[in-house]
Swiss-Prot record:
Protein name per UniProt: Uracil phosphoribosyltransferase
Encoding gene per record: upp
InterPro entries per the UniProt record, alphabetical: PRibTrfase_dom, PRTase-like, Upp_B, UPRTase/APRTase, Ura_phspho_trans
PANTHER family in UniProt: ADENINE PHOSPHORIBOSYLTRANSFERASE, URACIL PHOSPHORIBOSYLTRANSFERASE, CHLOROPLASTIC
Keywords: Allosteric enzyme, Glycosyltransferase, GTP-binding, Magnesium, Nucleotide-binding, Transferase
Annotated residues for binding of 5-phospho-alpha-D-ribose 1-diphosphate: R77, R102, D129, P130, M131, L132, A133, T134, G135, G136, S137, D199
Binding site for uracil: I193, G198, D199, A200
An annotated Gene Ontology molecular function: GTP binding
UniProt pathway: Pyrimidine metabolism; UMP biosynthesis via salvage pathway; UMP from uracil: step 1/1
Catalytic reaction(s) noted: UMP + diphosphate = 5-phospho-alpha-D-ribose 1-diphosphate + uracil
Length: 212
């Protein structure tokens, strides 16, 4: 698996806003939107393109477009915040959904939604989730995608923890690339990323009020 930590001043500045505990929901959402677009831009660099003839106002030239736009699959709830940034970069992408919440006692993922095409074989997939902590939720999502034939999966996570990255590598699943803004060193006893940015879903939308 190829791991790309995107090192850029604008990426670092938006990540800093998201990390700051004093950033309110609106500031956090705005920074996440900007950062999401930047990471999707970077993750798209290896997508296959095709060329076609087009007319400008003054001449004929060759244009470029994606041969097969990826399907964007957010792990919701927090991944919902990455849909609009992804579509701003790739407006003709399809969107699927995988819903998972975290059991706050066991720290294990609890799936509650799967809305995906039946056949994902030979279809580029961008699996997006702001946080890669233990890797449990992402690995569960990856196995769901693989069960539908996905063999070209790119994970886009804003903040990744080293234990989660290690779990992804050791699981030997069909992920070709991981794009992230940072790899933080550790998790605390509640399985939150340290230094991290807290609970991305809560900071986007407010506290979750559904009992699992």
């Amino acid at each position: 698996m190829e791991i790309q930590v995107v090192n850029h001043p604008l990426v670092a500045s938006r990540l800093s806003i998201m990390r700051d505990k004093n950033s309110d929901n609106a500031q956090f959402r705005a920074a996440l939107s900007d950062l999401g677009a930047m990471l999707i831009y970077e993750a798209s660099a290896d997508l296959v393109v095709e060329h076609f003839e087009l007319e400008t106002p003054v001449a004929t030239t060759t244009g470029t477009r994606l041969e097969k736009p990826p399907i964007i699959v957010p792990v919701i709830r927090a991944g919902l915040g990455m849909i609009d940034p992804a579509l701003s970069m790739i407006p003709d992408a399809q969107v699927g959904f995988i819903g998972m919440a975290r059991d706050e006692t066991t720290h294990e993922p609890v799936p509650y939604l799967e809305a995906l095409p039946d056949d994902l074989s030979d279809q580029p997939v961008f699996l997006v989730d702001p946080m890669l902590a233990t890797g449990g939720s992402l690995l569960h999502a990856i196995r769901l995608l693989e069960g539908r034939g996905a063999n070209d999966i790119t994970c886009v996570c804003m903040v990744s923890a080293q234990p989660g990255v290690d779990a992804l590598v050791e699981a030997n699943v069909g992920v070709r690339r991981l794009y992230t803004a940072t790899i933080d060193p550790s998790l605390n006893k509640e399985a939150y990323i340290v230094p991290g940015l807290g609970d991305a879903g809560d900071r986007l939308y407010g506290p979750r009020n559904i009992d699992l």
